[in-house]
Amino acid sequence: MEELLIENSQRFTIFPIQHPECWNWYKKLESMTWTAQEVDMCKDIDDWEAMPKPQREFYKQILAFFVVADEIVIENLLTNFMREIKVKEVLYFYTMQAAQECVHSEAYSIQVKTLIPDEKEQQRIFSGIEKHPIIKKMAQWVRQWMDPARNSLGERLVGFAAVEGILFQNHFVAIQFLKEQNIMPGLVSYNEFISRDEGMHCSFACFLISNYVYNIPEEKIIHKILKEAVELVDEFINYAFDKARGRVPGFSKEMLFQYIRYFTDNLCFMMQCKSIYNVGNPFPQMTKFFLNEVEKTNFFELRPTQYQNCVKDDAFAFKLFLDDDDF
């Protein structure tokens, strides 16, 4: 039986620490805590309106994916990993990750509410699984590999790394290119926060596979999972570019195809497997961002000096007028 799944009936508290490396992962993740209201999107509204319609359509597909994907990640954490895993240090990490995923989900909802005032169009994005066949297909694939009745813990961790890494990565890339155009500063800031978090989540899954999983899946199974994820990303990219009529400034879909293969080979390395694609990075000017090497000081520099919120719906507004008696 996997060590991660063995109950220690004699352990009731986190101290003394028994798995220091896992504890260090948790503490690093804890240090990255932020809230969805910390990003100012007021300047994004004009940039969004000035953006060519095909480009807006492309980014709407990305938002539709993210709104759904984070909820599925939360579902897996709460219904599977957090119920099964017994090593407290790992459980602490996943508890913190679940909280972060809730922040991400809220952040994407704020982005949709801020940029897309039409309620019917908002609902089409919030209902991504029903309205976008490729998003439904991706969601089904994620649930398939997260199913404990069908897959070993090792296989599910590989699938989880593929979700947090491969399925998300090209979308992070596409949003980050808006920074090069000097537009959408709020969306870009959210992207930098979230991509940093997801990089940690993905890396931790790879760490567990390499250091804690006894029944590591065969290399051919790992490759199968990763290649399936790449194929889904390819399909999504084609779909999003079709919606944009093939016109998205800064990159082509062929560059995104190559990048996701480059990223997947990096995942193979982290899982101590042979590379699959052996391709170079088509975006060398953004390597530091893509590999989540942003320094912690830069992360905190992203925080605005005051909280602002441009969403007009009171249900999404952040209440800043609490006095001390409310705590």
Swiss-Prot record:
It catalyses: a 2'-deoxyribonucleoside 5'-diphosphate + [thioredoxin]-disulfide + H2O = a ribonucleoside 5'-diphosphate + [thioredoxin]-dithiol. Its cofactor is Fe cation. It comes from the Viruses. Transmembrane segments: none annotated. Keywords: Deoxyribonucleotide synthesis, Early protein, Iron, Metal-binding, Oxidoreductase. The keyword Flavoprotein does not apply. SUPFAM superfamilies: Ferritin-like. Its EC number is 1.17.4.1. One of its GO terms (biological process) is deoxyribonucleotide biosynthetic process. InterPro entries: Ferritin-like_SF, RNR-like, RNR_small, RNR_small_AS, RNR_small_fam. Coiled coil: none annotated. Binds 2 iron ions per subunit. Fe cation 1 binds at residues 70, 101, 104. Fe cation 2 binds at residues 101, 164, 198, 201. PROSITE patterns: RIBORED_SMALL. The active site is at residue 108. It holds the Pfam family Ribonuc_red_sm. Induction: Expressed in the early phase of the viral replicative cycle. Ribonucleoside-diphosphate reductase holoenzyme provides the precursors necessary for viral DNA synthesis. Allows virus growth in non-dividing cells. Catalyzes the biosynthesis of deoxyribonucleotides from the corresponding ribonucleotides. Belongs to the ribonucleoside diphosphate reductase small chain family. Heterotetramer composed of a homodimer of the large subunit (R1) and a homodimer of the small subunit (R2). Larger multisubunit protein complex are also active, composed of (R1)n(R2)n. This is Ribonucleoside-diphosphate reductase small chain. The lineage of its organism: Viruses, Varidnaviria, Bamfordvirae, Nucleocytoviricota, Pokkesviricetes.
